[in-house]
Amino acid sequence: MLSSIIHNTDSFIASVPKLKRKKYGQFFTNMATANFMASLFCFDLTKPELHLLDAGAGTGILSAAVIDKLIQSGYTGRIYLTCYETDELVLPLLKSNLELAKEECGINYEIIQDNYLTSQLFEDNPLFSDNTKLYDYIIGNPPYLKIPKEAKEAKAMPSVCYGTPNLYFLFWAMGIHNLKQDSELVYIVPRSWTSGAYFKRFRQYLFKHCVITDMHLFESRDKVFDGESVLQETIIIKVK
């Protein structure tokens, strides 16, 4: 299944100019990276159902990698996958790829065509979290894009923003917000969050709510996204 989705994605990438994808911070994960990210999860195979989240799902590569890993691990329960995606160019392929996953693996899926960051309430306060949808396993390759401090996404998450924020750490913070207790999140992100005043509030939020259990730094930027030029050093990180 994953190899078919990778093939479909490669065809899509070839059809969309790189500058257009760069404008939205889109960099699609290759198969080796997706499989490695999925391998970091310690799945609880005893649960009768598992809820997965892929925010900014793109063509569904990471979702497929997690599903593949679950099936290979012998999981026989129900799998519920939620994907957020708003790119009209990508959506038809995402739907097609998830239909393939449904046919081959029997998953249930939902595609939410809404802004992941502004469509739900983000508050660093449990009193505001009663209606938050929570997930067992969250995987993500968020967009790498600086936004103005006046952007609606920044205004929706003021407690983690300072100065000029980047979408990737806002996605990451919201992912932590959507994570069930003692569950796991694996993201691929730039290394820039580790230092600097712009990321201080996010780091405080991260270490208040999570523990970092795994971190992988790539030797070469070229190994992460096939055929893409990513200037920032990139890491894969797992928290719970």
Question: What does each of the following model-derived ranges do?
Answer:
Residues 1-46:
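S-adenosyl-L-methionine
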Residues 13-18, 74, 152-153:
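Surface-exposed beta-strand-to-loop junctions
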Residues 22-23, 27-36, 57-64, 78, ...:
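Signature of N6-adenine DNA methyltransferases within the class I
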Residues 38-43, 67, 71, 176:
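Generic structural signal for well-ordered alpha-helical scaffold segments
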Residues 48-58:
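Conserved class I S-adenosyl-L-methionine
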Residues 68-80:
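Conserved S-adenosyl-L-methionine
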Residues 94-107:
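Short, conserved SAM-binding/catalytic segment
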Residues 106-116:
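Conserved SAM-binding strand-loop segment of SAM-dependent methyltransferases
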